[in-house]
Regions:
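Short amphipathic alpha-helical coupling elements at transmembrane boundaries
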Residues: 12-23, 48, 52, 132-139, ...
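Intrinsically disordered, low-complexity non-transmembrane regions of multi-pass membrane transporters
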Residues: 112-135, 169
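Alpha-helical membrane segments and immediately flanking helix-loop junctions
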Residues: 21-85, 183-234
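Juxtamembrane boundary at the C-terminal end of a transmembrane helix
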Residues: 255-263
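Membrane-core helix-loop-helix motifs of multi-pass transport proteins
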Residues: 55-110, 230-255
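N-terminal signal-anchor module of multipass membrane proteins
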Residues: 1-12, 20
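Alpha-helical transmembrane segments in multi-pass membrane proteins
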Residues: 15, 35, 39, 93, ...
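Transmembrane helical segments that form the transport core of multi-pass membrane transport proteins
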Residues: 134-212
């Protein structure tokens, strides 16, 4: 789809918005929509592809990565809300917070370059599009699956060796239940496992929504590794990407809190 005329049409339509908000081309809007539809790490992959094809600069790519590293509705509503917490309402609250958090987060990392690239159009490659797409998809699936398996194995070992005992002990002194602490720490490493553990703690709906929103927007180190395999192509330091994910997580959790208080 990245090679079709649909992308060029979307780019032209979204240029006024993305240029005004983030000082990047309209193609950033396409990356954003693909990311919120497909989830991690699609946004990172498309951003890296655009940079490698010289459609965006390194500075623009760094800005785009701040608001296009997102989860998708299938995971948020289907897996987390319905599958783990048995609550559709929770899913919609988290999804809205997650998307708004990403949009706001992008403003914090607005491109500061002089940019007149918002009218870029994507050029169709001369190679076989089907072959390239199939190859890229297979590599992406293997990459994602590999990091998930490795992260799950590392987390299982850490839990088995009780390596979270120290932070659990520290937070317990502030009245925080050990199961909640363990769930959050697990989610920071592998988000799906952490959220599943959180759903079994029996905490309130409001607290579940806020913590889940934070963890999903942060993504977990497993997702960080997946995304960074692509993002490093335009010299984005991991420390900068980590900062982007932390601010996204804080903003999303804050938006979740506001939504809960209002509605």
């Amino acid at each position: 789809m990245s090679y079709t005329a649909i992308v060029n049409s979307a780019t032209k339509f979204l240029s006024p918005f993305t240029h005004r908000l983030y000082n990047v081309g309209g193609v950033a809007g396409y990356v954003f929509f693909m990311s919120i539809i497909s989830g991690y790490p699609i946004g990172a992959k498309i951003t890296a592809d655009l940079y490698q094809n010289k459609q965006i600069t390194s500075g623009q790519a760094k800005t785009i990565s701040a608001f296009t590293s997102t989860s998708g509705p299938l995971f948020i509503i289907g897996t987390v809300a319905v599958g783990f917490f048995q609550s559709h309402r929770l899913g919609f609250i988290i999804l809205i917070s997650h998307i708004l958090g990403a949009i706001i987060n992008g403003l914090l990392y607005r491109n500061k370059e002089n940019s007149n690239t918002h009218n870029y159009t994507l050029q169709s490659p001369t190679q076989n599009i089907l072959n390239d797409s199939m190859y890229s998809s297979i590599i992406s699936i293997m990459l994602v699956g590999g990091f998930i398996a490795i992260s799950y194995m590392i987390l299982s070992i850490m839990l088995h060796l009780n390596l979270f005992s120290l932070p659990i002990s520290i937070f317990s002194k502030f009245g925080i239940d050990k199961n909640i602490t363990s769930s959050i720490l697990s989610g920071i490493i592998e988000v799906t496992t952490g959220l599943n553990m959180l759903s079994k703690t029996g905490i309130s709906f409001n607290l579940s929504a806020i913590i889940s929103s934070f963890l999903i927007s942060f993504g977990g180190l497993s997702i960080h590794a997946q995304a960074y395999c692509y993002l490093k192509s335009f010299n984005l330091k991991y420390s900068h990407f980590l900062k982007q994910k932390i601010t996204h997580a804080i903003i999303s959790a804050s938006v979740t809190f506001i939504i809960i208080m209002i509605f």
